[in-house]
Amino acid sequence: MQSSSPSQNHSTQVPIKVTHRQVKKRAIRRRRVDLVCGCSYYLHINCFNHGFTHRGSHHCSSSNEWRVYLGNKQSPVFHNHQAPTTTIPAEPGHHNSPGSIQSQPEEGAGDSQMFSQLPDLDNLTASDWSFLKGL
């Protein structure tokens, strides 16, 4: 049966497997961010306004930390790192002092706070156990 279209050049759809294979081979778009301490990290190009603390300093992935890489000696990799003039203040309620170590509570053999209100576990029925296992 002949096509009713006057055009002889019909495009065929690319199979989805071929498309997926091409996308997987594509380089992940990410940016390199150099920190004052000399460390660097890579950030996905669509990820922004997320922060973290590293060596006692809070870092936010905002546009202030991006650097343009020009290659050779123009690249910031070859420049001396200087401390930033402005810092992001720590949010209230967070304890970000670099020298403090938070102690962990000691383990004990007593009742935990979560299970102190439960009745004796020997009194649980089979339906109670099946309900708990389903959680």
Swiss-Prot record:
A motif (Nuclear localization signal) lies at residues 17-32. Residues 77-117 are annotated as: Disordered. GO terms for cellular component: host cell cytoplasm; host cell nucleus; viral capsid. GO terms for molecular function: DNA binding; structural molecule activity; zinc ion binding. Residues 120-135 are annotated as: Transactivation. It is found in: Host nucleus; Host cytoplasm. Phosphorylated. Keywords: Activator, DNA-binding, Host cytoplasm, Host nucleus, Host-virus interaction, Inhibition of host innate immune response by virus, Metal-binding, Phosphoprotein, Suppressor of RNA silencing, Viral immunoevasion, Zinc, Zinc-finger. GO terms for biological process: symbiont-mediated suppression of host innate immune response. Its main location: host cell. Residues 77-88 have a biased composition (Polar residues). It holds the Pfam family Gemini_AL2. A zinc finger (unnamed) spans 37-54. The keyword Signal does not apply. The zinc finger and the transactivation region are involved in PTGS suppression. Monomer. Homodimer. Homooligomer. Self-interaction correlates with nuclear localization and efficient activation of transcription. Monomers suppress local silencing by interacting with and inactivating host adenosine kinase 2 (ADK2) in the cytoplasm. Interacts with and inhibits host SNF1 kinase. Binds to ssDNA. Belongs to the geminiviridae transcriptional activator protein family. Strong activator of the late viral genes promoters. Enhances the expression of the capsid protein and nuclear shuttle protein. Acts as a suppressor of RNA-mediated gene silencing, also known as post-transcriptional gene silencing (PTGS), a mechanism of plant viral defense that limits the accumulation of viral RNAs. Suppresses the host RNA silencing by inhibiting adenosine kinase 2 (ADK2), a kinase involved in a general methylation pathway. This is Transcriptional activator protein. It comes from African cassava mosaic virus (isolate West Kenyan 844).
